[in-house]
Amino acid sequence: MNDNIARKMQQTYNIAYWGGSYYYVNDLGNVSVCPNPDLPGAKIDLAELVKRVQQEQKHLRLPALFCFPQILQHRLRSINAAFKRARESYGYKGDYFLVYPIKVNQQRRVIESLASSGEPLGLEAGSKAELMAVLAHAGMTRTVIVCNGYKDREYIRLALIGEKLGHKVYLVIEKMSEIAQVLEEAERLNVIPRLGVRARLASQGSGKWQASGGEKSKFGLAATQVLQLVETLRAVDRLDSLQLLHFHLGSQLANIRDIATGVRESARFYVELHKLGVNIQCFDVGGGLGVDYEGTRSQSDCSVNYGLNEYANNVIWGIGDACDEHGLPHPTVITESGRALTAHHTVLVSNVIGVERNEFTQTTPPAEDASRPLTSLWETWQEMHSEGNRRSLRESLHDGQLDLHDVHTQYAHGMLDLTERAWAEELYLNICRRIQQDLDPSNRAHRPIIDELQERMADKFYVNFSLFQSLPDAWGIDQLFPVLPIEGLDKPLDRRAVLLDITCDSDGIVDHYVDGDGVAATMPMPAYDPDCPPMIGFFMVGAYQEILGNMHNLFGDTAAIDVYVFDNGEVTYNQSEEGDSVADMLQYVKLDPNVLMARFRDQVKGADLDTGLQEQFLLEFESGLYGYTYLEDE
């Protein structure tokens, strides 16, 4: 495979833009991973890596997550560097801390890889369980802990204990009823609390996650409540405890203008609080830093029209400008950029278990006494091959669709038999294929027809995974994730395909794909080789997907492999997750595997079977109980 073909593959799947320099197509036509773009020699062929791990770890079965902790650390360095440049550029005198909200991915490998990176990093918790995880890892970072979410007294006490241990723990007030509990528990523990307030802004981002920001958001205090909080603290001489201002515009903000507008409004809260005598020291802009899942660099829901540097510049300039205008000190800026930290670092790899393709047969004329829809279809087919054809491609397609609809209607009323219906459907497929061959992708008028026919004619690839477990946001909120074969891209991409999972649910299908023209309903694929089926990679699944995945059809967590790539060519890995067994999933729903085994054994013993067959059936059942929930190769 030469460089020209490699470049073409980069464009075909838009990988050059969504890959973030971490993923690219190599000269062999396989996807390569470069976990640290600052060390371009430290790279690994993903397909070869999967095969190596399968060979060395005989028990490993696909699907499996391949995780690259070095990407996490590079993302952390990149975000910190962007804010350092912005502060230097605008003469910003305050500090900056990136805080990781662990709800994005609470896996141990993620928290420990980030906390042990040597980079400044804070941690954020939104529940008691998360706070316990954060406190246990806080000794590795020694910076900032932000406590969000609704809180009971136990949550509050844990946070105050963290303060007592020497951490900077900010209890962010989300509702007015929390403040009395915080003050009471702080007095009992003899701790001066560090408080934050989450202000509910009028500004709101757009997109799939817009409800998490704005005036109707679930969390935060309205302007009147912020004033009440200030007076409550002033009355008990605890105004100095209120040190952090927090706001949240929304997750995955696509438009930089929304970010700039939100920062400008929140900066007014900072100014007004100082006028009230509140010495706010930290300005937490929350989440919102998005990633470009589709690589279009646009304002669409799964893209962003800005980069790290522009984001940092807008945040730092917006806050600094308001401070300078009113002669106020520059606060420490905090961002909670969990998605931007984690999305790139994980790839789900799985195997294709089967393909359903349209088969094109030799066309034959209908019977002389065939019904009108059948003869009309044949006339359309013949006219398409005649030199004097005056029908447009669109007209031929519409005529064929109308005739096929009439065929289905007549079949439903018993006027046509199954053979006639099958003949009509095969001829219609041939008409569609002929129209496809004559369409010109550069003709804008042809694009809707091309898209329609690609979807109609696409191969169905059945992939060994659960959309609901591994890509829950693709099902739940129609989020797009980059998907492509991780091998065989040196072959012509002369097919279009859709991917279906193995659940018994019609929603288990990937509806949207990234290609060179943006987003499409099908994906380009090489011709399917049953002797060497391709492995499929689902990219940028490191944020939220692992923790949101559900157990539909009792498909469980997949295996996970942590991979480290070094510039001397060395590659090491360890399997951090075994993947759920059938027994694991049954126990989740309170079905005891031992009880099931005993009941099945009773049935087998009571059946009229010879001893050898009984033992075989029992062994098969027991083996299945402790096997992988996904389809396993023999």
Curated annotation (Swiss-Prot):
Binding site for substrate: 283-293
Modified residues (N6-(pyridoxal phosphate)lysine): 103
Record keywords, A-Z: Decarboxylase, Lyase, Magnesium, Metal-binding, Polyamine biosynthesis, Putrescine biosynthesis, Pyridoxal phosphate, Spermidine biosynthesis
GO molecular function: arginine decarboxylase activity; metal ion binding
HAMAP family: SpeA
Its job: Catalyzes the biosynthesis of agmatine from arginine.
Name by which UniProt lists this protein: Biosynthetic arginine decarboxylase
Organism of this sequence: Photorhabdus laumondii subsp. laumondii (strain DSM 15139 / CIP 105565 / TT01) (Photorhabdus luminescens subsp. laumondii)
